[in-house]
Structure formats: C-alpha cells, structure tokens
C-alpha cells in the first residue's frame, strides 16, 4: 500500500488486475491469493450495515447551516455505533477501500501491487466510489439523459427544502430558476418571522455570505462530453440576482426603531426576512434578545414640560418680569432702623439696643430733637430710690402694667424711650421686653409695624450716670436699693418683681400664678383679660359673646 498512490487506492477492485480477487486465481501469485470469506456469497455489505441503503456522498442530507465543523460532527455521530458497520461512506473512508478487504495478505500486496494505468473514464456505471471522494477528479462516464442540477450553495440544502415544504410556505422571491430547461419557479419563503429569524441566526453564526462578485463559477457537471452550468445559460450577475421587492411601510413614529410589530404576522408576499429570496442582504436579519419577550414600547414618557429641544432655547431667550421677593421678618425689622447711636452686647440674650452715657447727655442737650417729637426716660427703680435721686426729666414706673396702660392708651409716633434702673441689668431689661411684647400684640394686624420702635437701655444705669454727670441729676444724691432704712420696701418691691417675672418654688403653673408676659408668644395675639384690651384701646373690643372666657384654675 505504501508503494501505491492514493489514486491507485481509490480505484475499484475490478479495474485493477482481472485475477486479483478471483476465487480461481493461480496460487503462484501469493500476494493476490483469494481472501477467506470473500466468495460470491461470503461478503454481504447490506447485512453488515443493518440492511440500510448505502448512500453516496452528495446524496447525504446536509445539516442546515453546515460548516466544516458541523460536517465532521455529523459524520462522527452517524458512524460511531456499537456492533454496527459504518452506515454512510465518508470522504476519508473512500480513500482506503482496501481496508474493507481485511489485512490477511498485507505483505504480499505491499510487495506486488503497483499503480495501474488510469483510464479517462470508468465504463462501469455502478462503481461510484470516485464520486464520494472530495478530491478533484473527472466525473464517471454514465449514460443518462441530460440533467441540470442546482448549484450546492449555502442558501439551500435538503434540510431547508424539507422544512420549507412542511411548513406550508408560499412562493415569494422574484428569483428565476430554470426547471427542466423551460419552466420557472419561485423559491418558497417563510410565513412566520420566528422561523426566518431562527434560520438567519443559524446561518450567521460562524460564517458570512460572500459577495456575488467574489463567488467562483457555478458548479459544473459533464454530460456526454458537454459542460453545462447549473443555470443552463451564461447568466450575468444582474440576471442571477434581482432587486428585493419593495413593500409599503406603514407610517411610523419618528423615533421608532422598528417598522414592523414583532407580534403581528407579516403580509403574504413580504419576503424581506427570508434569506432565500435572492437578495444579497437577505441574511442580515436582526434578531431580538428573546423570541418570547414582549416588544419594547416605542413611545417615550417624560415629565418634562418641553416636547422639543427648541422650546427650551426659546424659553431661555424670553425675559420674565417677576415680582420682588418677599422679605423675611428680620428684613422687615431691619428696615425700621434705629436712629440713635447704639450697640448690642454679645453677653446679653435680650438683643435690646444699648446707649452709653454720652448719648444720653446729647439727648438732654437736644441734639436729636429733630428726629423725635418726644423722648421719654423711664426710671424702673423703686419709689424710695427715685426720690433719693434721679436723672432730670426721668419718669418713675416700677410696675409694667401701669406703664403699658399709659403708653398704649394713646400711642404717640416718633417717640424714643430710654429705660434704666440702678445698674440696668435686671429690672430695666424686664420692663423693656414687656413693653415690646405688648407693642407686638397691639400691632398684631399690622406686623411688623411697631408703635415704639426706638427703645433703648442706658448702659451702666443710674449709678454709672450719677458718677460722671452728677449735675444732670436731681437731687444730686444716690440711694442704693439695699439701703438699711428701706429694707422693708425693698423686700416688697422684689416680691412683686419675682412674682411677675418667673415661677417661684411655692407658686407653680398649676395654680396660674405665672407672669402675664409668660403666657403669650411675642408674635401671637395677646390673651390677656378683655378688660385690659379695652383699657389699651386695642382693636379687639369687648363683646357680649367674647371668645376670651375666664381662665380655669387647674390642680393636679
């Protein structure tokens, strides 16, 4: 076998030497002596192959979308069986036909076998082993009528033809293919787009369709010495491929990415999704991610107030005239600027403005008379302190209720009020805060308007002013609050201050003994007795059905 060529191995046994495999061959040819079991009835290939027909290579059904890897896998899956002979002759097996004859006289064959002369064509019509070889060779001489076969391309295969015929397909493609030399037919197409997408997907995996210009000439067969192509005529590319049919598309949205609903069947005659309609771009079918997935909605929902980008640009060019922003409470309070030079100490939590002694001297000298119509100096000390010595022109008020009744009985605009006590630490700030609280309640319907916006506290009190400006005091004396001779009056006065200022240990909220200024919010409506409102000339007049009943005394 090693001294022979592959062509000698592919030759039929009957073509070699006439006495090679005969039963009556002479014994002198020990290399070609008859093999045991190869008599007329000793070798039955059909029984060995489980009585299955021995098909040729080109008659084998090719797997749809076949490739070299798929062909090899098909051959292996069909021939590897237990206790069975090979079913289908493969190209590689046809090269070694001598393997079927056994290895009994292998040495004699190697010694005596030589390459016989190659005939131009085989006279035996039944010897078709050459047809099973993939090597280029001359077709066998067979006396059959003229037959025209289609070129074996990737578009069509026996498997595809079977599937197309079983699915009830209708012809759609305008491609013309000759049948019996005269009759024309159309290639069938799929009705269901799901099958078309599956076929297109299997075709696209691992291979691409070559361009029509790069394809070789059609496969040729020889009949009676005359070469004919599969089309029967020398057709050009324009004749072989026709234009894809134009189908009417429904009006879709501008932002639509698909012109056809995937859940609806395409109309009959629409073959744009079938790869066998003759169009070079028929195989380029876009497959969805999942066949059973619901299609994405093409409409886009948005919460934007603009439908087009041009609207945003147009609105940016338009100038809007909006109202002035509302000022906050602090802005309104700052608009009523204080007219006297003042300062607010950081260690004090009341945020009430303070003036120094020099400013008070300027007020006494009349430097600010053009700013105010009236300037009041309120002395918050007890009566014995005031009588012992006070600033000239100061008025004594140690009761907050009496001072509020006096001020809001007839409010006077352009009035400045200066509070002071002995040191201006406790009694004067309490008096000033209460007056501001009543002022807010009085002007609750005109917030943030105030009847007395200019309220100040003299820094250092009477003790500091008397030390520097004794001449502006009358009598020019200074009586302290803790004087021994006024000890009883001091205790009585301090009791009133503590009772009205904060809760004491024995007087709790349960008995309603709190100070009136602790009841209300600085910016809320005053909830004092109706008689007090009437006394202060408040807009909340008393009525028979007053909504301010008497306060209930609760105890727990």
From Swiss-Prot:
InterPro entries: MPI_Phosphatase, Rhodanese-like_dom, Rhodanese-like_dom_sf. Keywords: Cell cycle, Cell division, Hydrolase, Mitosis, Protein phosphatase. Residues 165-186, 257-297, 505-556 are annotated as: Disordered. It catalyses: O-phospho-L-tyrosyl-[protein] + H2O = L-tyrosyl-[protein] + phosphate. The keyword Cell cycle applies. CDD domains: Cdc25 (cd01530). Residues 505-516 have a biased composition (Polar residues). GO terms for molecular function: protein tyrosine phosphatase activity. Residues 287-297 have a biased composition (Basic residues). Pfam families: Rhodanese (PF00581). The active site is at 421. Residues 371-474 form the Rhodanese domain. PROSITE patterns: RHODANESE_3 (PS50206). It is an enzyme of class 3 (hydrolase). GO terms for cellular component: cytoplasm; nucleus. One of its GO terms (biological process) is positive regulation of mitotic nuclear division. Its EC number is 3.1.3.48. This protein functions as a dosage-dependent inducer in mitotic control. It is a tyrosine protein phosphatase required for progression of the cell cycle. It may directly dephosphorylate p34(cdc2) and activate the p34(cdc2) kinase activity. Belongs to the MPI phosphatase family. This is M-phase inducer phosphatase. The lineage of its organism: Eukaryota, Fungi, Dikarya, Ascomycota, Pezizomycotina.
């Amino acid at each position: 076998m090693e001294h022979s060529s592959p062509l000698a191995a592919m030759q039929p046994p009957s073509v070699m030497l006439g006495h090679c495999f005969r039963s009556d061959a002479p014994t002198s040819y020990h290399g070609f002596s008859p093999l045991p079991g190869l008599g007329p009835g000793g070798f039955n290939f059909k029984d060995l192959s489980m009585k299955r027909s021995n098909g040729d290579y080109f008659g084998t059904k090719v797997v749809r979308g076949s490739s070299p890897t798929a062909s090899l896998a098909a051959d292996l899956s069909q021939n590897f069986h237990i206790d069975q002979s090979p079913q289908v002759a493969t190209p590689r097996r046809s090269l070694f036909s001598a393997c079927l004859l056994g290895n009994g006289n292998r040495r004699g064959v190697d010694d005596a076998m030589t390459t016989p002369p190659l005939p131009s064509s085989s006279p035996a019509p039944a010897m078709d082993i050459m047809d099973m070889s993939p090597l280029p060779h001359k077709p066998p001489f067979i006396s059959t009528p003229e037959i025209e076969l289609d070129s074996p391309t990737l578009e069509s295969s026996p498997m595809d033809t079977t599937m197309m015929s079983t699915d009830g397909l209708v012809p759609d493609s305008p491609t013309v293919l000759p049948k019996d030399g005269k009759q024309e037919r159309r290639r069938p197409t799929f009705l269901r787009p799901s099958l078309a997408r599956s076929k297109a997907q299997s075709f696209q995996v691992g291979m691409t369709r070559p361009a029509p210009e790069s394809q070789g000439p059609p496969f040729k067969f020889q009949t009676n010495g005359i070469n004919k192509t599969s089309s029967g005529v020398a057709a050009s590319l324009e004749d072989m491929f026709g234009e894809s049919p134009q189908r009417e598309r429904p009006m879709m949205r501008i932002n639509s990415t698909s012109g056809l609903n995937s859940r609806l069947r395409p109309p009959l005659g629409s073959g744009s999704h079938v790869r066998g309609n003759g169009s070079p771009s028929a195989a380029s079918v876009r497959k969805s991610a999942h066949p059973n997935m619901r299609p994405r909605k093409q409409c886009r929902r948005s919460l934007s107030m603009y439908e087009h980008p041009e609207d945003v640009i147009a609105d940016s060019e338009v100038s809007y005239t909006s109202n002035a922003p509302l000022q906050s409470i602090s802005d309104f309070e700052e608009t009523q600027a204080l007219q006297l030079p003042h300062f607010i100490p950081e260690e004090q939590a009341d945020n009430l403005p303070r003036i120094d002694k020099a400013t008070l001297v300027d007020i006494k000298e009349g430097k600010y008379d053009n700013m105010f119509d009236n300037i009041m100096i309120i002395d918050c000390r007890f009566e014995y302190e005031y009588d012992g010595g006070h600033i000239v022109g100061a008025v004594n008020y140690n009761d907050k209720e009496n001072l509020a009744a006096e001020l809001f009985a007839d409010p006077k605009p352009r009035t400045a009020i200066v509070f002071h006590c002995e040191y201006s630490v406790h009694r004067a700030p309490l008096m000033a805060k209460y007056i501001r609280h009543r002022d807010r309640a009085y002007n609750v319907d005109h917030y943030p308007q105030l009847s007395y916006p200019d309220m100040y506290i003299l820094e250092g009190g009477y003790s500091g002013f008397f030390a520097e400006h004794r001449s502006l005091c009358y009598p020019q004396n200074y009586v302290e609050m803790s004087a021994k001779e006024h000890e009883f009056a001091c205790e009585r006065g301090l009791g009133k201050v503590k009772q009205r200022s904060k809760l004491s240990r024995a007087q709790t909220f349960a008995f309603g003994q709190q100070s009136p200024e602790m009841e209300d919010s600085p910016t809320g409506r005053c909830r004092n007795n109706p008689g007090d409102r009437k006394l202060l000339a408040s807009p909340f007049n008393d009525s028979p059905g007053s909504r301010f009943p008497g306060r209930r005394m609760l105890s727990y």
